[in-house]
């Protein structure tokens, strides 16, 4: 059947040949576009996440191989989407008539393109959802009817605790917005507050950056102008860190850790 899966796929043929057909099931103007070609050992193809994949083997002893960039899981399987091989609107010229091909019972009952469900984008996780910024993000998401957002605070996901990361299937996420932080500037100067500030503002972002880098997730990290000494009215990307207190120092350390994630944005509030 034509299955769109929630990962990228690289397909090659070790021997023999196949007729391949791909249907774009991602939301947008390209939804429903079809591409077909014959693959043999001289040609491979990259199939992006959300593009439906199907093929017919054209020779005996054909060996079809593929590499994907995520592990199968039940949660991942729930995000699959499909379109029917026989949909006349796809105009796929199958070299082997479908009535002579081997198809599963499920393949026979997949929806036509007009009823097919677009592949949903990967989820967005928001940390620190009970803080001032987190509540504002949730309010915006709700007001605009945005889908695919998941909100966590320290009671559901303490992102400064390494042991909590294995609870999540990170391949399901495309973006993490880190709105969580220890923001009690004065209390950060106390012995107890100092430890809490460094845990939330430095260790937590470092752990988020690592998991985001491992899973090609975009990390949006909210920082502060406290990482500077206040000698300039306006701050640009080239200004060096010069924090004066524990809060600013811990935030600067977190910012440095976040830059190790290839796909990151750092936003500074003031």
At which residue positions do the language-model features occur?
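Non-catalytic, conserved peripheral segments adjacent to functional cores
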Residues: 1-40, 59-63, 68-121
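Catalytic helix-loop patch of NAD(P)-dependent Rossmann-fold dehydrogenases
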Residues: 195-207, 227-267
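Adenosine-cofactor binding site in Rossmann-like domains, unifying the SAM/SAH pocket
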Residues: 148-167
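NAD(P)H-binding glycine-rich loop region in Rossmannoid oxidoreductase-like domains
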Residues: 162-200
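A short helix->loop->beta-strand "cap" motif at the edges of active sites that frequently abuts
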Residues: 214-217
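SDR active-site strand-loop-helix element
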Residues: 127, 152, 176-180, 219-224, ...
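Conserved SET/PR-domain catalytic core that frames the SAM/AdoMet-binding pocket
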Residues: 39-58
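N-terminal Rossmann NAD(P)H-binding glycine-rich loop of SDR-like oxidoreductase domains
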Residues: 123-144
